[in-house]
Structures are given as C-alpha cells and as structure tokens.
Amino acid sequence: MNTKDTTEVAENSHHLKIFLPKKLLECLPRCPLLPPERLRWNTNEEIASYLITFEKHDEWLSCAPKTRPQNGSIILYNRKKVKYRKDGYLWKKRKDGKTTREDHMKLKVQGMEPVSWQCLYGCYVHSSIVPTFHRRCYWLLQNPDIVLVHYLNVPALEDCGKGCSPIFCSISSDRREWLKWSREELLGQLKPMFHGIKWSCGNGAEEFSVEQLVQQILDTHPTKPAPRTHACLCSGGLGSGSLTHKCSSTKHRIISPKVEPRALALASISHSKPPEPPPLIAPLPPELPKAHTSPSSSSSSSSSSGFAEPLEIRPSPPTSRGGSSRGGTAILLLTGLEQRAGGLTPTRHLAPQAEPRPPVSLAVVVGSEPSAPPAPPSPAFDPDRFLNSPQRGQTYGGGQGVNPDFPEAEGTHTPCPALEPAAALEPQAAARGLAPQLGANGRRGNKFFIQDDDSGEELKGPGTVPPVPSSPPSSPSSPTALPPSGRATRGEALFGGSAGSSSELEPFSLSSFPDLMGELISDEAPGVPAPAPQLSPALNAITDFSPEWSYPEGGVKVLITGPWTEAAEHYSCVFDHIAVPASLVQPGVLRCYCPAHEVGLVSLQVAGREGPLSASVLFEYRARRFLSLPSTQLDWLSLDDSQFRMSILERLEQMEKRMAEIAAAGQAPGQGPEAPPIQDEGQGPGFEARVVVLVESMIPRSTWRGPERLIHGSPFRGMSLLHLAAAQGYARLIETLSQWRSVETGSLDLEQEVDPLNVDHFSCTPLMWACALGHLEAAVLLFCWNRQALSIPDSLGRLPLSVAHSRGHVRLARCLEELQRQELSVEHPLALSPPSSSPDTGLSSASSPSELSDGTFSVTSAYSSAPDGSPPPAPPLASDISMEMIPGQLSCGAPETPLLLMDYEATNSKEPAPSPCGPPLAQDNGAAPEDADSPPAVDVIPVDMISLAKQIIDATPERIKREDFSEFPDAGASPREHTGTVGLSETMSWLASYLENVDHFPSSAPPSELPFERGRLAIPPAPSWAEFLSASTSGKMESDFALLTLSDHEQRELYEAARVIQTAFRKYKGRRLKEQQEVAAAVIQRCYRKYKQLTWIALKFALYKKMTQAAILIQSKFRSYYEQKRFQQSRRAAVLIQQHYRSYRRRPGPPHRPSGPLPARNKGTFLTKKQDQAARKIMRFLRRCRHRMRELKQNQELEGLPQPGLAT
C-alpha cells in the first residue's frame, strides 16, 4: 500500500475510509445506474464499478429481501440490515445436509492481483433443482456490508437450441427435501429460474412450458423408491428398502404375497390416425421402447411415482369398416409381482387383438392364470404349487384369473393370450383395482368381476371404489351385475359406463384417489374393510413428519405437522390401515407412536372422528442391518419378519426332504387320513394358515423311525421351527406342531425342531420370544405345553416374565402369572402307590408306553422337556391313585418318563397319544376355556438313583454277590430268567455307556438329582431291602408277597445294575473332583497373581510412605538447622558489637577521627552486610546517647545557677 499511489475515498453512509489503487480508480468509471436485470454474468470490472460507486449506494440499496428473484436479477443489499440469503430458493447443501455449499473466490480487476490490494471477493451457490441456476454475491473486502447479488441460469443462451429440455439434478442429497413439494411449489421454484428462457427441440416444435418441465421432474424423479414389502434375502444384505430389487425366488414370493405395483399406462386410439407423441416423453426402462403417454396431472405423477417400472402398451392399429373407424380398445394393466418362465409378461409388447371390437372398452387385467380347476395335490412339497395353487385355509393369493363377461350383441369375446401369464393379485388388492367401463352408441356398460378359485364368499362394498364422474355431456348408465354361471361373484363394478357418441378415452388420473398408493402396497388382514378413498379434494396435506422410518418393532415417536388446530378433535394416525391414537402437542403438530409392521413402505394418513383429514404420505419400515446375528444380546429379541418366514419354509422343506429320503429307503410313510379342512373364519394371517395346512398335510404322511439326525447346517440364529413360530405369534402353527410332536413321540428329528425348552444362540426359549414380542395366545400355548420354560433365563439372566414387563406387555405377563398361581394352588403331592402285583418284577414302578428315548435328555436343549410335562390347571387327584395310571394321565403332549432307568422295557401296546393343551386362550379375557378336554395331571416322583443303588448293594445277599454272573443259568431257572439273560449283557453295556455319558448331556440340575421341584421318593432302609430280597429263600411272608419276590437271577441283575450305577457315579465323582481341582488350581493361581500384585503395590506404598516421612523429617531438620545457624551468626555479631561498645565507653574523650577514608584493616571487621547495618545502628545509638548526656549536663548546670528573685 505504501509503495503505490492510493486514493482515499470516504463512504457517505458509514464514513468508512477505503483505500483503492489509483490505477483501479482511473480505469473503472463510475456507474450512474444499476441495471435491475442482466441475462449474462457481469465482468469483474463491472462488478467493481458497481461496488465503488458509493454515492449511489443509498439509492440502489434494497431494504427488504426479495422472494425468488427472477432469472437475471441484480440486487444490492446491506447485509447488516437485510438477510439476503433467505430468498426462497433451495440451494445445494453439503454432505451433512445442514449447511449450504458455497464456493468462494477472489477476483482480479484489470489483471491486478487481488492479494496486492485485497478489495473484491465473490461467493457462488448452485440450485438444488436446476444445477445451472446460480446465485453470485460480490463485495469489497474493505466494505463487506454492501453486497451485490446476481441470479442467473448459466447456459441460458448457449444451450437453448442444443437439447430438448434443461438439465435437472438426478442424483442429489437434497432431493429428499424438494421432491416432497407439490406441483404448485415446484412451479413457484422453476418459473423465476426460467424467466426469459425459451426452450425448444430445434426441430420446429413448440416451446416447452414450465409446467411441462415440472411434469418431467415429477415423472423422472420418483418421490420414494419402489415399495418393497420385505427385504430380499437373495441380495447381499437385508437392505433398507432403498433399491428396487426383482427376485423370482419361490420363498421370496411366499413371504410377501403383496402386489408390487407398476406404472399404469393408457393408450387410446382415435378415429382417424394414431396419436402424435407429446413433446414430453416419460422415461421407461432402457430395455423397453417408450410408450406414448399423455402428461397426466401432478397428483397422478406423484401417486404413481413410487411404482417400480412403467408398462408398455402398444395400441392396436386402427381398422375401418365401411370406410370409418367405429371404436378402439384401451387396456389398463395392473400386474402382480413376478412372471412364469416362458410366459409373455405385460412389460413386453402386447400383441394386437385379432378382431378389434367396435365398442370402446377398458379391461382390467388382474389375474395371472387361466380359469382352470386346480391340479390334485401331490404328496411331495412343491414351493411353486404352494404359492400358485391356494388350498384350504388360504387367505391371500388372489383368484385364478379374470373372466370378464362382455354382454354385447355382436361379436364374441376372444381373450388376449398375452395377458394370461401375469401374476395373481390378492383379493383385497384386486377388489380395489380400477375398471372404468365406457359404452358406445347407447350400449350399456360392461361389468367386470374378479373371481377367486373356489370361494363363494362375496366381497362387500367397503373395499370397492366409488364411480368416477364422467364428462359433462355424458350421463352415467346404471350398471347391472352379470355374474358368471356356476360361480359366485367376488367383486362389483368399480366404475359406471358413460353413454354417448364420443369414442375417445379420457386420460386416466389418480388425482381422485389419494389413498390408492397406500392401498396397493398394503397387506390388509382379511375381514378388515379398507377405508373408501376420498374423492373430494378437500383433504389437507401433511407438510412434514419426522422421523420418516422405523424398525419393524415400531414404538417410535412420530411428529406430524399440518393444519391441525382443533384441540377437541380426536386425532388418529393410520399406518397401513392400523390406526393409532395421536395427541395434539401444539397447534399444527401431532404426536403418535408407530405400530409394529413388516418391512416395506406403508401409507400414513391423519384421521379424525368422521374420517380421513389428510392425504396419504409414505412411511418406511426398515429392516435391521445385520446379516445373521445381532451385534449384542440387547438387539437379539427383535422381529425380522422376512427372515423368520424364510426360515420356516426352509425347515419345512428340509423335513419334507427327510420324509422323502425315508420313503425312498423303503420305509414308506403310512397313509393316514387327510387333515380336516380349515375354516376361513378367524384363521389369522394368510402365511400362517398356509403353513398350517402344509404341516397338517405332512402329519399323516410322516414316519420318523430312523435314529439319524437331520443335518441342518447352520440354522438361522440357532432358532428351531418352534422358535420361529413363537416369534411370529403363530398360535395355530404352534398348536399344530404340538399335535405333530404328540403323534411322533420317538422322533429325534422332530424333537430338534419342536421342543418348547430348546434355546437359541442367546439361550432364548420359544416362550421367551413370544413374551418379548407380545404374542399372548402363543405364550399361553407354550406355557401350557411346558411351564418349565417360564423359569429358563436367557444369557443375560432375564426371565420371560421380566422381559414381557420391560417391553410393555403387561397383560401377557399378568396372564402367565395368573396361570402359574392357579397351577401352584392345585398341586398336591401324591402318596406312594401300593406295590405292583406283577410276578415278573418286584419293584413298584411305572412302565412307559413310549420309546426309551423319551426319557432321555434332549440333545438340542439346555433343559430337557421330557421329565416334566407342565400340565394345565387340573383338579387335585386322590392320593390313592396307582402309579400305573401315570402314563395315561400325562398331559400337554409331554413324553412320559420311566421312573427308574433300569425299567427299560416298554410295553407292546401303544396307548393313544394325549392331546395337547386346550384351545388357545381367548383374546378378550385371557382365561382358559372351561371345556378344555385336557386329562388330569399326575406328578412324577423322582428317585435318587445313587442312594437307591447303595441300598440295593448293601441289602443283596453275599451268595448273590459271589455268583458268576456270566454263567448260563441252570436248567431249573424260570423262563423269565432264560429270556432275560440274552439281553442282559446288552442292557448292562447300554446302561454303562449311558451312565458314562450322562454328564455330557446339557442339564441345569446336578447329575445326582433330576431337575424336579417336587418331593422325592423316600428311600427304604437296608434292613427293609434285606427282608424283601431274602423273602424268596427264607419263606417268610410267602403268603403275602409270593408274587412280589425276586428270583436269584433277577436279584443278580438288580445287583449288577446297582454296581454299574455306583461305578459310573464314582467315575463321574472322580472326574468332577479332577475338574474341581483344576478349577481350584486356576482360582488359586489367579488369586496368587493378584496377591503378588497387591503385595508389590503394598510394598511400593510402604516405601513411598517411608520416603515421604523421611522427606518431611529432613525438611524440618533443615529448617531448624538453618534457624540455629542464623541465630549463632546474629549472636556472634551482638557479642562483637558489645565488645566494641565497651571499649568505646572506656575512652576518655571523643576520638579524633581522621578525615580520610578508613584504613583497609578496619574494613575487615565488618564481614557482612548485616554486620555493617548493625554497626550503623550502634553508631546512631551512641550519637543519641552522647547528645542526651550533653543535654543532661546543660540541665544540671542550669539548675546550679541561682534563681533570680530569690537572692534577697
């Protein structure tokens, strides 16, 4: 600055002194006028000239910010007085989505470096909708308050003739904001941006209008991704539903039988020539040619923008009879999810019809299969048939096809073969399909019916759509129902026809149906009527809502803004036809909590007492982002609907393959009776009903006699089939599985999948899942099945009831607690039954009619479900019930357990399996029904085998112990002994192997005692056993116990069994002792390490303490030493001074003091500075003393003089 000539300029308004280069002021003239608009960017010189014309700034300044200035506007602001950045436009933001993205630059003027004088600065921002629209702000760094703002669409003049439309932001982080706007808001944004711009295709066609540009934005930028009702498992992850994914997997389609709507396209045929393509062409997928569509309204575009892909419909060529065209055909396609292999889908070219029909009609294609009777059921499980051929109990899946009946006078209906392979729609979505019918030449309108395969239930009116009013000249004709012969109708005419001479089809618009999008993507439960779409445009719009998504568990607080002001109104929010209460937090803001729902997009709407109050918006349910396992235990008990459904089907397929392998090996499954048909009323969701039907069809065909186990690979999260059913809340499936388990009691494969005490990777039982997710009916069924699951904690130590309380399922927890109290109140211990009168055995025991494997521990469960079958509440039993009645009285499908392990022989007669628990608990009162036909329960009293074996060994006679057990019994032995000897060695080896491995089975109780909570059987003393065993030889009590005595061989067998048990227990005890020693050694080693660490810490602490004490002592001693040293120095100085003073006093007169300096030797007396000071003090004291002595002498002399006046 000091090396160049500068000019001082003072601004009039702020009196600021701005120093600018003299060369700059000479080359830039002052501007007399600021142009309000300029359709090009200003040069740097022009910008600088505007900013340095200070005398005109007061005249040019704008006092208020302008809202959405037009293209080319130039405005001057004072940033201290006007917030010019709030101009109404939406500018690009940074990646964080909060701050605007700005580009800053220093500008050169006349080639002068800005660093040399630091005067001109610029800031640029770009539009988020049209990236070529900029706002540039300029100011002087020495005068930053005055800002020159210029709005301009950059390629306005250069690129107008090159393309057919401007460039829009296709991928932007801000799209979520501006794509929520309505058509009017987008028009308000774009009109000022394209002010003064003329767009054309350069081929003589008419210019584009801003309305067409807005329509193009709405067509090419969908507001939301295509609705996905579940996360696809075929892709890389579970996904959040943000990408459109097509999958033809069978399980994929079974899990989500919803309609994935695609775009609706209409092609109308005029009288004379095909329609010309409009200037705006809606985009289609790259593999399909673009269909000619007319631009529809804004609501139509916004409503259909979430569809996956548009359809392509090729219009039929016009034909004429007698030189004039009489009509045409328009087809509205509403396709389903997928296509069959080899079929021609509606997304491909539609072949023109062979014979065009004269009247103009509009057919709704909603079916996928031709009307044909279903094939007979095959014995093997076919997933494709499971999807496409609904059987009894199906509540979704749609009809077999469409059978439109055209009651026309001339011509017969020839269905288009290309329309048949489309996928089927569910009845609810099909009933809401759109079928406008237009008549011609005074003919009556046609009626279209959507028919199911074998259901004669008529769909009522609430699910239909009211008629759309036709054009003013046409009068609606009264529709007449024409049901096909032999079948009941499943729908009504959705639109009435219009009689008139016009054959042109009106363009189809979704503006009258704000809820169509939400209805198409919803999966409504049967029996719940859908709310009728509102035709009136008086519905308010939801301005904003947050958050926009939730996990499938729901419970997230959602705030919704809009024109809600009535405090007395009873507001509710409808999530996919699930209404939840809403409260008015403040005027314009509603608060609600979203319900649980499966993954996908759902419609959200605000409703009042009299009906809907707002239009629908899209709310998203996202899947949790984990592939197989949650990251922590806290995220474990969460519903992953699609994965659970997939896993259920995988388990059923594996079981079906297992059955097929058994059948192929020669063990043909027994042909049992067919399962009874399931009623349609109250059967729950469709997926559960169809799985129940599949399981019921597998029950009579199943045979599980092989000892092999199913190889499942890696099960989903360690969850069994019963886990998955409980997590989904499928009570009917749980009941069916319990019936299957009761029928097949000896199946280890079935025990792996259907065990109420089985646990997953985090030790959660099926009852834990049902309690955590609030499925009351399923939880009660599982509790009735085996109440022991209520006391099994997960890996965090939480019990099912505590999890239910913590998650807000209070009603479920109270119901289970009440059932538990009822069972505990009716329990009574059973007395011992009288001894059995069987001549073959001398032990009173209960023979189990089931296989031996029922009494063993479950190898897939940490807790065995076999020993303790938890029965439902039953009246108390008499105390004299015999123990033989136990097998017939075990309830709830729990397998019976032999009282003793040595009672290994099963009876040949199989008793019928007991029925499982009563019907599911009623949802209204939570109490079990009175007529539950469950048999009464009897407690199974356990026996301590170790103590019993010891008593048996002590009581066995010595001669029995000394006998060689391996010898063959003598000829006089009973036939029972002969037959028993053959399998005795096998029995003993089996018993020994069992007892060797019994501790390896996972069990919560110690091996010495079974996991029971009831009283134990009293062990008889040794004398009683001796008396009992010696009764066969002594002859005592033969009259009373002749039938209860044991033979020598039986006694020897009993003795060997007791020895095996005792030996196994000793081995187990030694092994346990060794394990305890190892654990103790590890504990001692760990404690010793800790002790050494603590000892070293204590030693360091003691050392530190001693060092501290020593430092304190040293410091105190040093202080005292220093004080003593100072005292001694001062004392020596005082003595020296005193000596000098005494010598001075002894002198007769004042010493003659030479005028010169003191000799050098005298200086040596004052060694230190303090001594010098002390000497000076002493000298001052001596001078005062000398002066006082003089005064005293003078006073004495004055007193000695005679006083005047006294002489006489």
UniProtKB/Swiss-Prot annotation:
Biased composition (Pro residues): 275-288, 371-380, 464-476
Subcellular location: Nucleus
Pfam families, alphabetized: CG-1, TIG
Residue ranges, annotated region (Disordered): 269-328, 366-418, 437-507, 826-881, 908-936, 1144-1166
Keywords annotated in UniProt: Activator, ANK repeat, DNA-binding, Nucleus, Repeat, Transcription, Transcription regulation
Any one biological process term the GO annotation gives: cardiac muscle hypertrophy in response to stress
Record's GO cellular component terms: chromatin; nucleus
Motif (Nuclear localization signal): 78-86
GO terms of molecular function: chromatin binding; histone deacetylase binding; sequence-specific DNA binding; transcription coactivator activity
InterPro entries: Ankyrin_rpt-contain_sf, CG-1_dom, Ig-like_fold, Ig_E-set, IPT_dom
Ranges of the DNA-binding region feature: 30-160
Ranges of biased composition (kind: Low complexity): 294-305, 319-328, 829-853
Listed SUPFAM superfamilies: Ankyrin repeat, E set domains
Domain IPT/TIG stretches: 544-622
Subunit structure: May interact with calmodulin.
Similarity comment text for this entry: Belongs to the CAMTA family.
Name of this protein: Calmodulin-binding transcription activator 2
Organism whose genome encodes this protein: Mus musculus (Mouse)
Taxonomic classification: Eukaryota, Metazoa, Chordata, Craniata, Vertebrata
